[in-house]
A protein has these predicted regions:
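An acidic-aromatic loop/edge-strand motif
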Residues: 2-33, 135-164
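Glycine-centered loop/turn motifs
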Residues: 57, 65, 128-132
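Intrinsic-disorder/low-complexity, polar/charged segments enriched in Ser/Thr/Lys/Arg/Asp/Glu/Gln
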Residues: 67-73, 84-86, 132-134
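A structural detector for beta-sheet-dominated domains
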Residues: 47, 55-57, 77, 88-90, ...
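Beta-strand-rich ligand-recognition modules
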Residues: 96-152
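Short beta-strands within extracellular/lumenal beta-sheet-rich domains
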Residues: 60-78
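Aromatic-lined ligand-binding clefts that engage carbohydrates, nucleic acids, or primary amines
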Residues: 81-99
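Catalytic-loop region of hydrolases
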Residues: 36-59
Length: 164
């Protein structure tokens, strides 16, 4: 507890917190997924069968030499115009995140207890209504959670689309 009789000190503390408060949230409930193999930089071989559609809460499987690509499109709604935008993503393992084709960062899952957890990607700010974000995650098995499973003999592991 802060022990100060000065009201302006508390008011200043509140002002410092306000920019970090989430005021609006836009859930991305459905993602397209396709699987394949990363061969070399910008060279991929995709599995036959096309894309699958996954929703938050669904599980997906990956293993050695497998790469999964998740994609979704978001259009900034009017009520988010002028605000700071962030993506909060937790798909299970680790993933490289591209926005409109450009690498913006990487995320790693909270489900891998003991390993680094990163789930925030900063977008261009301030947001402008109508702006389109094409989001793509390139997820592979190089995550700590899979290493633990592989050491125990697993060839594949299941992850969950937790947050988007």
């Amino acid at each position: 507890m802060i022990k100060t009789p000065k009201l302006n000190v508390i008011e200043n503390l509140v002002k410092q917190v306000n920019p970090y408060v989430i005021t609006d949230e836009l859930i991305i409930p459905v993602w397209r997924k396709r699987d394949g193999v990363h061969i070399a930089p910008n060279e991929y071989s995709f599995n036959p069968g096309g894309e699958a559609e996954l929703s938050l809460g669904d599980t997906w499987e990956t293993g050695y030499d497998m790469t999964s690509w998740f994609s979704a499109k978001v259009i900034v709604p009017e009520e988010m115009d002028g605000k700071k935008l962030y993506l909060r993503l937790d798909f299970g393992g680790e993933a490289l995140v591209r926005i409109n084709g450009a690498i913006k960062g990487a995320v790693s899952s909270r489900m891998n207890s003991g390993w680094v957890h990163r789930d925030i990607i900063h977008l261009d700010n301030p947001a402008r209504k109508g702006t389109v974000y094409n989001i793509e995650l390139e997820a592979t098995v190089n995550s700590g959670g899979f290493c633990d499973a592989a050491m125990a003999g697993a060839k594949t592991v299941f992850y969950t689309l937790n947050t988007a």
